[in-house]
């Protein structure tokens, strides 16, 4: 893996298809302020915006969350399936069926047994994507800070769909053409925590020097757990994962 990997190569469709990708619905913790006030009104626990990704290794380089300005979103009161903590989360209305069991809708939040089964949930508020724009959230992994612009806020983008995921796109400008375009439009900075060999940079703490994909290791040297899996476990422990597959 001595050859340089351009972000173009890293983003080629099918580059990673031989291995089973780990996907995660990540929870980004909303900061309370004037813009987010309506999300905190009668909230249940902390408030999160949920974003799905099949490239967890790009999450430390997250700089923004992109929503569809005209898409319908809802606020859901529920529990984290891993930590069992109460939480309020934002997802696209049309994606509720992908993440919540219909039979548990409007079940009693007070009677939840905290066993990860039959997690109750309740829709409590509906709004358009453009109403979320400008809301700020806590940095997920504060290994390093973005450069060259603003960061950690919700922006609007025309490429967001509800065909899969949560209707919210985790946006890492260094690792995607759409991400870079929409970030520039909104004055969002960049954060690149992967070197040209495909390894995490020294800022990445316990992950520094690890290849972002096990396929990049020399034959026989790949660890049992890829960094995607390690990051997903860390997110579960932090209470920042809603679904890992």
What are these regions, as identified by a protein language model?
Residues 1-50, 57-59:
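Active-site cores that bind ATP or allylic diphosphates and position pyrophosphate for catalysis
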Residues 37-49, 56-245:
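Non-cofactor substrate-recognition interfaces
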């Amino acid at each position: 893996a001595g050859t340089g990997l351009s972000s173009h190569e890293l983003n080629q469709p099918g580059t990673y298809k031989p291995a089973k990708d780990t996907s995660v619905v990540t929870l980004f913790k909303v900061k309370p302020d004037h813009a987010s006030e309506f999300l905190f009104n009668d909230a249940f626990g902390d408030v999160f915006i949920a974003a799905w990704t099949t490239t967890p290794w790009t999450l430390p380089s997250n700089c923004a969350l992109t929503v569809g300005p005209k898409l319908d979103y809802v606020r859901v009161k529920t529990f984290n399936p891993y930590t069992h903590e109460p939480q309020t989360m934002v997802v696209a209305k049309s994606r509720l069926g992908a993440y919540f069991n219909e039979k548990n809708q409007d079940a009693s939040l007070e009677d939840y047994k905290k066993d990860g089964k039959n997690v109750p949930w309740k829709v409590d508020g509906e709004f358009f994507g453009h109403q979320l724009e400008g809301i700020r959230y806590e940095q997920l992994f504060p290994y390093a800070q973005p450069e060259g612009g603003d960061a950690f806020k919700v922006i609007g983008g025309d490429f967001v769909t509800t065909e899969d995921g949560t209707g919210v796109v985790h946006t890492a400008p260094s690792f995607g053409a759409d991400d870079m375009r929409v970030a520039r439009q909104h004055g969002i900075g960049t954060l690149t925590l992967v070197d040209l060999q495909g390894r995490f940079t020294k800022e990445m703490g316990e992950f520094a020097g690890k290849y972002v994909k096990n396929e990049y290791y020399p034959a026989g040297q790949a660890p049992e757990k890829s960094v995607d899996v390690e990051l997903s476990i860390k997110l579960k422990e932090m209470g920042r994962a809603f679904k890992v597959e």
